[in-house]
Amino acid sequence: MTTATDRQAFHARLLEIGKERYHDKHPFHAMLHGGGCTTTQVRAWVINRYYYQSRIPMKDAAFLSRCDDPDMRRAWRSRIEDHDGGVEEGGGIRRWLRLAEAVGLDPAYVGSARGVLPSTRFAVDAYVSFVREKPLLEAVASSLTELFAPKIHSERIAGLLEHYAFADDAALAYFRQRLAEVPRDVEFGLAYVLDHADTREKQDAAAQALTFKTDVLWAQLDALYSAYVTPGRIPPGAWDGREGVIREPRAREAAE
């Protein structure tokens, strides 16, 4: 085992991964936040991102099933509640389906995940498997993309409000709520990683786990861009731009 670099330097290393690799720099997000997406492209993003959102509590449940420490389970289980909500209301998944309805999609269709791109499904399922199978330190480290999430949520709220008529408080409730939830989650996760990555090998593994997670996020956007922007090659079985649409866009929404 090699002596770990100091805590501050390791923290800086993790932040640098986000600076270089986080998906806020993907061209699809520039289009989305700048009002450059068509209605079809926005809907495709909502459909595919739903699959990621829906698997987050499954990922966290897999993590908890491996965790022997009750204090850690108590701290982590709120992540499942944040996404699944209560029996009748609340939760990020329900908020995301409100966004789906706001952009003219049938929430039941989106929730079925029938139109999800194969690459999206593959990337997200790989993330769930990673958390289920890797050491706890690496599983926690893979969640640290949350360090960089508040910036993109803020940019998304501002951009959608400026450019798309569907954007109102109800439609954007998911992002506003995440701005409140993420700081708590990332404080715990970051402290755990900094405390437990006590050798250089563990630090390297944690950094690689965070890099893997940025790849998962980037791969989803690459698939979306390829299918619905350019070259516009939609894989068999993926959303065709028509299924699940329940209304046409209003005047200020992105036009075909």
From Swiss-Prot:
Q: Which Pfam families match?
A: TENA_THI-4 (PF03070)
The entry lists its GO molecular-function terms as:
pyrroloquinoline-quinone synthase activity
Catalytic activity, per the record?
A: 6-(2-amino-2-carboxyethyl)-7,8-dioxo-1,2,3,4,7,8-hexahydroquinoline-2,4-dicarboxylate + 3 O2 = pyrroloquinoline quinone + 2 H2O2 + 2 H2O + H(+)
Q: Which GO terms describe its biological process?
A: pyrroloquinoline quinone biosynthetic process; sulfur compound metabolic process
Instruction: Give the main EC class.
Output: oxidoreductase
Q: In which pathway does it act?
A: Cofactor biosynthesis; pyrroloquinoline quinone biosynthesis
Give the keywords, sorted.
Oxidoreductase, Plasmid, PQQ biosynthesis
Q: What is its EC number?
A: 1.3.3.11
Task: Write out the similarity annotation.
Answer: Belongs to the PqqC family.
What this chain does, per the record? Answer: Ring cyclization and eight-electron oxidation of 3a-(2-amino-2-carboxyethyl)-4,5-dioxo-4,5,6,7,8,9-hexahydroquinoline-7,9-dicarboxylic-acid to PQQ.
Q: What is this protein called?
A: Pyrroloquinoline-quinone synthase
Organism equals Rhizobium meliloti (strain 1021) (Ensifer meliloti)
Q: Which gene encodes it?
A: pqqC
